[in-house]
Regions:
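Asp-box/BNR beta-propeller loop motif
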Residues: 21-30, 55-74, 99, 103-119, ...
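Repeated scaffold domains used in trafficking and secretory/extracellular systems
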Residues: 36-39, 79-85, 122-129, 225-230, ...
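Entry beta-strands of beta-propeller and related beta-repeat scaffolds
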Residues: 47-50, 90-92, 134-138, 190-192, ...
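Beta-strand-rich domains and repeat architectures in extracellular enzymes and scaffolds
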Residues: 29-55
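Blade-level signature of beta-propeller repeat domains, shared across WD40, Kelch, NHL, RCC1
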Residues: 320-345
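Residue-level detector of Asp-centered blade-edge/turn motifs that repeat once per structural unit
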Residues: 42-45, 86-88, 131-133, 186-188, ...
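Bacterial Sec-dependent N-terminal signal peptides
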Residues: 1-25
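Short glycine-/Asp-/Thr-/Trp-enriched loop segments that recur within the blades
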Residues: 31-32, 75-79, 120-125, 168-178, ...
Length: 345
């Protein structure tokens, strides 16, 4: 691994205010916001954090009744954040394009510091997650002949990029999609990373990212906007991948697959909604929710069949740990909803 020089400095939050929420009906709360949001992280039923375009991040502590909106300032950059992760005491947000900037934010004070910076002109970061309070991972498109993967083992204070000699090689034109902050899925000490473009593969890392293997998938691939957009695990053995062709969202062939052997093999799911940017298991169940700009979809039994439950489209969403609340986001909007209301829409 190559050690990356990290620049630290402390900054203060600006432009903190509360957004008014439109309550459509009991159980559904929506808010308009002046940014595009592709990164969400749910702490519990009532608390959700977001990161988006125009240097913005924020949160709700009251089930989406009110939202706090904050702005990070770094030089004169107009930053777009498409990755967010939350630990016990900190929030981490990562900008998408070069220079890739990763900030650690104190939950109580909302002061923040830069903990990782990558200036390679090819830098493009897609997703970030933490296993626990100490170990975290972020993934980006290749800057050499492998995916860009950076790790932290000290609670996010420092990050190291894994050298390509320790990673599976990437095919030219293979990358990842920064569509929903869900092309990483963590379970136990493993990481599942989804790719797309010229090839659609799943990289599986063990022992907090120490060793890696790449597995081929049957998801549609070969063009710039085809491949896997989202991955989520039910267990170490069982995971689902979803994506498709962003330029032909109505296509349903080869857009969703499941593994029951830890990623070694993947079986296509024929009855699926077509293009999906985010798919998530409802915790402790075999039920799934999926979303894209075409709508929201629901499956009761390991994706065997799907029902469209809303025509309203969202880039991404998250489910609270006990499965009671969901938070959705898209272009200029945030929505919170309890699971009973969602399934009865």
């Amino acid at each position: 691994m190559n050690r990356v020089v990290v620049i630290f400095f402390l900054l203060s939050i600006s432009n903190l205010f509360s957004q008014s929420v439109y309550v459509k009906n009991q159980g559904i709360r929506e808010v308009e916001i002046d940014c595009s949001i592709r990164a969400l992280e749910v702490e519990n039923d009532s608390t959700c954090w977001f990161a988006g375009s125009k240097n913005k991040f924020g949160n709700t502590n009251d089930f989406g009744n009110t939202w706090n909106e904050n702005v990070i300032k770094y030089d004169t950059f107009d930053l777009e954040f498409r990755s967010i992760s939350v630990t016990t005491n900190s929030i981490f947000i990562l900008s998408v394009e070069s220079p890739a900037l990763l900030f650690k934010i104190d939950k109580k004070t909302l002061n923040y510091k830069l903990v990782y910076k990558e200036t390679n002109e090819k830098a493009f970061y897609d997703s970030m997650q933490f296993w626990d309070d100490e170990n975290g991972i972020a993934v980006g498109d290749p800057t050499a002949n492998c995916m860009s993967i950076v790790l932290t083992k000290d609670g996010g204070d420092s990050w190291k990029k894994i050298a390509c000699e320790y990673l599976p090689s990437s095919k030219e034109g293979e990358a990842a999609f920064a569509a929903s902050n869900t092309n990483i899925s963590l379970v136990d000490q493993k990481a599942f990373i989804a790719t797309g473009g010229k090839e659609a593969n799943v990289l599986v890392g063990t022992d907090y990212g120490k060793s890696w293997k790449k597995y081929k998938t049957p998801i549609i691939q070969g063009e710039k906007m085809t491949g896997i957009f989202s991955v989520n695990n039910l267990s170490v053995d069982t995971a689902i991948i979803a994506g498709g062709d962003w330029s032909a969202k109505q296509k349903i062939e080869n857009t969703m697959a499941i593994t029951k052997d830890g990623g070694n093999s993947w079986q296509l799911i024929e009855n699926n909604p077509g293009y999906i940017s985010c798919v998530q298991f409802i915790p402790k169940t075999k039920s799934l929710v999926a979303s894209s700009t075409t709508g929201i979809y629901y499956s009761e039994e390991l994706a065997e069949s799907w029902v469209k439950i809303s025509d309203e489209g969202y880039y991404t969403f998250r489910v609270s740990e006990n499965g009671s609340y969901l938070y959705f986001s898209g272009r200029n909007n945030l929505m919170s909803i309890d699971i009973t209301t969602l399934l009865n829409k």
